[in-house]
Amino acid sequence: MEEDFVSQLAATRLERAKVIAAAGGIDEAIASGQLSERIDTTLSEALVLGLLQQDVRRYLVVLGHGSTEIGEVLRVYEEAGVIQTYAVRHETAASHAATALRWVTGEKAAVVTSIGPGAMHAFAGSLATASDGLGVYYLFGDETTEDEGPNMQQIPKHEQHLFLKLCSTMGNAYCLHTPLSLPTALRRGLNTIDHPYRGGPFFLLLPMNTQPASMKDFNLQELPVGTPPSLGPAQDDGRYQQAAKAVAKAKRVVVRIGGGGRDAGPQIDQFLELADGVAITSPLVSGVIPYEHPRNMTVAGSKGSICGNHAQDRADLLVAIGSRFVCQSDSSRTAYPNVEQVININADLEAATHYGNAMALVGDAAATLEKLNEALEQEQTVAPGTQSDWFRECVAKKQEWDSFKAERYNQPTLQDSVWGGQVLTQPAAIKVAADWARSQGDVVNFFDAGDVQANGFQVVED
């Protein structure tokens, strides 16, 4: 009897999946009359359908007894051609692959693991997802909701939802304790992974007893769609004019470009000219203005360049655009010793108010800069193209930096006592790889953490 039920369930799922595949999506299948708005399903199938509505079609998986039911649903929907699964050897690798996919192509993916150690491996890998602000779903098998005692593969403690607490420290998380809570969980997930300014990992914990739970007459229209909207420009209240006056008064303007400024290249370029400022960039936005741009002083901070750190140390006004002020960028609060005022443009309130004596402009970076540039044009007292002492000083430092790097590229090897011969230096090796990647046009570089990462910041010339 049980085998008959399982076989019938698989057949029903496959038929439904084929209808969706043929129609091109859930909404199209409903519109064609081939799929009812209300279906009898299980939580795991409804979850896969909900993720499909959010255009999640790729799953990187290391399955186990904690994810048996979700794995069965994925098997059926892959057979129908609706989704694709990729079995990988390690959960951390799955996490990194999903992160890279979102970063390079913008495509969303989900990482699926079993209960306990596997989930912990993927959780460790999600640090990259969180650090780089990229939206990825994580589906972890979880202990049952019946509290029959600690699960031997999870945290051995008599307390509820310990993995939920753990995951909530890295990003947003939700335990599917009740099948009908699925729409709420998926809306929170959608708002997290498609956040317009800073995405992140979203952890869905799937208790083993709720994964196969039936959902009778479930309304597919409850599955959330629609990405969260972006902000407009920061509210005025006279602050644009106030900021423009502060910029016009300053003698040495530096613009710190963080990840939130990656889509504001033209507006930043115009601002630099109007403000007679120079830019220092975070590694995330290498290329937001070209390396060759005369006002681009490249990276600054504890792993910065000669010219970037000079601009950071000498500036009297800081304009921060989409920056989080991580320890490496502002040298653990020792940077900007001569800055007297900060204009902080950010979509996040906490980041926008990070520094004291700051004028916070909370809004979209590009839209806010457009309004600030309009205000600056009214305040401008220096003719465009004029080369100030500040500009010439920074240009000279960039020339010094380029010469410093050239010396090391011209001597690409050093004698190494361990290897007993000449060994390629790290800057030279990275330079060769970066130049080759750029020459190919479509090759992406990923840098490991630590000193490789630091030299990568300094070598790349996007």
Please annotate each region the language model reported.
Residues 2-385, 432, 436, 441:
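N-terminal alpha/beta PP-like core and its mobile active-site loop of ThDP/TPP-dependent enzymes
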Residues 11, 342, 396, 407-410:
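A generic structural signal for solvent-exposed, polar alpha-helical segments
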Residues 43-54, 65-75, 269, 398-462:
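Active-site diphosphate/adenylate-binding microenvironment
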Residues 202-205, 389, 446-449:
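Short coil/turn segments at secondary-structure boundaries
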Residues 383-403:
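Internal, active-site/partner-interface "lid" segment
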